[in-house]
C-alpha cells in the first residue's frame, strides 16, 4: 500500500509538472504568434492592423496587381511615387523614368554608392562649383575606408584619413 501511495503521489506530481510545462509552452507560443501576426501573415484580426501590415509590405516588398491595388486614395498615390523614386535612386531604372532625373544626379548617386569613374574626368566635367566639394567628400570617404590613389599632400586631415585607412584597410 505504501508503494501504491508513492506511485500515486509521483503520478500526481508528474501530471502537475506536465500541466505547468504545457501552460508555459502555450504562453510562449502565444507570444511568438503575436509577434508573427504583427510582422507576417495573420488569421484575420483587426482590419486596421492588417492595412498597416499590407502597407509596410507594399513599401518594402513585392506588390501584386490584385483588386486591393484598385483602392488607392490620394495619400497612397503619393506613397507610390515615393516608393518609385526610391527604387529609381537605388535600384534598376527603365525606359521613360530615366529621363525624369538629370544625368548628373544619377551619376553622382551612382558614384556615391557604387563604382567611380576616373576622378580627373569628373573634375573636368564639374568645374569649380558646389559639386566639386561633393566630389571631395566622396573621395575622402572612399580614401578613409578603401584604397588610396593620386598623390595628395600630407596634412593633419590626411593623417587622420591615413590612420583610419590603416585601421580598416589592408
From Swiss-Prot:
BP terms from Gene Ontology? determination of adult lifespan; germ-line stem cell population maintenance; neuropeptide signaling pathway; response to heat
Q: Its domain of life?
A: Eukaryota
Which named protein is this? FMRFamide-like neuropeptides 6
Bias (Basic residues): 159-170
Gene name?
A: flp-6
List the keywords (alphabetical). Answer: Amidation, Cleavage on pair of basic residues, Neuropeptide, Pyrrolidone carboxylic acid, Repeat, Secreted, Signal
Its family? Belongs to the FARP (FMRFamide related peptide) family.
User: Highest lineage ranks of the organism?
Assistant: Eukaryota, Metazoa, Ecdysozoa, Nematoda, Chromadorea
Tissues showing expression? Each flp gene is expressed in a distinct set of neurons. Flp-6 is expressed in the ASE sensory neurons, AFD, ASG, PVT and I1 neurons.
Q: Which residues carry this modification: Phenylalanine amide?
A: 39, 60, 90, 113, 145, 168
Q: Which residues carry this modification: Pyrrolidone carboxylic acid?
A: 20
Q: Where is this region: Disordered?
A: 150-170
**Assigned GO CC terms:** extracellular region
Localization of this protein = Secreted
Q: Kindly indicate where the leader peptide sits in this chain.
A: 1-19
- Primary residence: secreted
The record lists the membrane-crossing segments as none
Query: GO MF annotations for this entry?
Result: receptor ligand activity
Q: Which organism is it from?
A: Caenorhabditis elegans
Propeptide cleavage-removed residue intervals: 42-51, 63-81, 93-104, 116-136, 148-159
Quote the function comment for this protein.
FMRFamides and FMRFamide-like peptides are neuropeptides. KSAYMRF-amide has an excitatory effect on dissected pharyngeal myogenic muscle system.
Amino acid at each position: 500500500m505504501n508503494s501504491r501511495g508513492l506511485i500515486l503521489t509521483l503520478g500526481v506530481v508528474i501530471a502537475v509538472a506536465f500541466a505547468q510545462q504545457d501552460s508555459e509552452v502555450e504562453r510562449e507560443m502565444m507570444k511568438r504568434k503575436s509577434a508573427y501576426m504583427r510582422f507576417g501573415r495573420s488569421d484575420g484580426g483587426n482590419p486596421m492592423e492588417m492595412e498597416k501590415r499590407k502597407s509596410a509590405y507594399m513599401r518594402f516588398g513585392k506588390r501584386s496587381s490584385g483588386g486591393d491595388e484598385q483602392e488607392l486614395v490620394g495619400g497612397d498615390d503619393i506613397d507610390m511615387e515615393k516608393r518609385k523614386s526610391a527604387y529609381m535612386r537605388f535600384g534598376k531604372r527603365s525606359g521613360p523614368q530615366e529621363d525624369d532625373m538629370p544625368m548628373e544626379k544619377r551619376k553622382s548617386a551612382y558614384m556615391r554608392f557604387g563604382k567611380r569613374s576616373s576622378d580627373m574626368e569628373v573634375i573636368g566635367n564639374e568645374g569649380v562649383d558646389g559639386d566639386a566639394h561633393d566630389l571631395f567628400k566622396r573621395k575622402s570617404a572612399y580614401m578613409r575606408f578603401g584604397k588610396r590613389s593620386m598623390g595628395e599632400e600630407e596634412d593633419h586631415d590626411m593623417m587622420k584619413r591615413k590612420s583610419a585607412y590603416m585601421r580598416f584597410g589592408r
